[in-house]
A protein has these predicted regions:
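Active-site loop-to-helix "anion-binding N-cap" substructures in soluble metabolic enzymes
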Residues: 20-192
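Short, Lys/Arg-enriched N-terminal segments with co-localized hydrophobic residues
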Residues: 8-19
Length: 192
């Protein structure tokens, strides 16, 4: 029993030393490359531990704007890295996992936007921040869940096409009944 416990403790210590060495290497690389690490709440705890900033996508986008570092390593889904690049075109934005994606971000298309534009007069296309750069490019305004109601109320347009999240659109429509909402069928598969 004693030998078994010693071996387990030894293995734990080896893992701790490796983790410390990796953290030290990351810190050194951040200095050499003038880089900062942003991590979304959804990433693994060990990634959050080495990050300079941890938060939701809106918080991290705001943080990204004020950074002095030339390289942003964004640990999150692709639309978050795209948003950081849009807000910081002069900086290098790296995504450690290019396969990290949010399916809802792709649940609308430029073609759908143009189709709806052709069917409605006095239309504003309102895009939730959790969407691709392509959707943002075809929209009139981009909002977050915390500012969407205020922005939609302030829009002069009567018709609102909210993309890509139908659930957030329904919520906003309930608070802004004077607008006519056209619903996209996008949704978050995690929250559905």
């Amino acid at each position: 029993m004693k030998a078994c416990c010693s071996r387990i403790l030894c293995q734990e210590r080896i893992r701790e030393v490796r983790a410390m060495t990796i953290r030290e290497e990351i810190e050194q690389l951040k200095k050499e490359k003038n880089a900062v690490i942003l991590a979304h709440y959804y990433v693994r705890p060990e990634v959050q531990e080495i990050a300079d900033y941890v938060g939701d996508s809106f918080y991290l986008s705001k943080v990204a704007v004020g950074l002095k570092e030339k390289t942003i390593v964004f640990c999150g889904v692709s639309f978050m890295g795209e948003s950081a690049k849009i807000l910081n075109p002069e900086k290098t934005v790296l995504m450690p996992d290019m396969a990290a994606d949010c399916p809802m971000a792709h649940m609308a298309s430029a073609e759908t936007i143009e189709k709806i534009r052709s069917e409605y007069d006095d239309l504003a296309v309102v895009c939730y921040i959790n969407s691709t750069a392509e959707l943002k490019r075809h929209s009139d305004v981009c909002v977050t869940s915390s500012n969407a109601v205020k922005i939609v109320k302030a829009l002069p347009n009567k018709n609102i096409f909210f993309i890509p999240d139908r659930n957030l659109a329904h919520y906003i429509a309930g608070l802004v009944p004077e607008k006519n909402f056209i619903y996209n069928e996008g949704f978050c598969i995690v929250h559905e």
